[in-house]
């Protein structure tokens, strides 16, 4: 009698990393906006390296760079 065929363990799910650099809303350069999170002061800053446009917003411990950038987009849309 033979041995049972052992099954392979299921493959691990690939977790995509969140971006840290974004496209500028004003000068349209790609990957030119850097988001800096200062958790001690509780503020996040998104700043373009090309046109120096910047946006500052309050953050909390669960905030990430994408949250600061999306707040900037929402603020620009509310003005228009």
UniProtKB/Swiss-Prot annotation:
Zn(2+) binds at residues 24, 27, 48, 51. One of its GO terms (cellular component) is transcription elongation factor complex. Keywords: Metal-binding, Nucleus, Transcription, Transcription regulation, Zinc, Zinc-finger. The keyword Transport does not apply. Coiled coil: none annotated. It is found in: Nucleus. The keyword tRNA processing does not apply. Gene3D superfamilies: 2.20.25.190. It holds the Pfam family Zn_ribbon_Elf1. InterPro entries: Elf1, T_Elf1_sf. Its main location: nucleus. GO terms for molecular function: RNA polymerase II complex binding; zinc ion binding. GO terms for biological process: transcription elongation by RNA polymerase II. Transcription elongation factor implicated in the maintenance of proper chromatin structure in actively transcribed regions. Belongs to the ELOF1 family. This is Transcription elongation factor 1 homolog.
């Amino acid at each position: 009698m033979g041995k049972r065929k052992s099954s392979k363990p299921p493959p691990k799910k690939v977790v995509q990393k969140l971006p840290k650099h974004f496209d500028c809303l004003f000068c349209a350069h790609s990957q030119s906006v850097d988001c800096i999170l200062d958790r001690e002061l509780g503020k996040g800053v998104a700043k373009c390296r090309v046109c120096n446009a910047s946006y500052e917003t309050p953050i909390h411990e669960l905030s990430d760079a994408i949250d600061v950038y999306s707040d900037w987009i929402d603020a620009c849309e509310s003005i228009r």
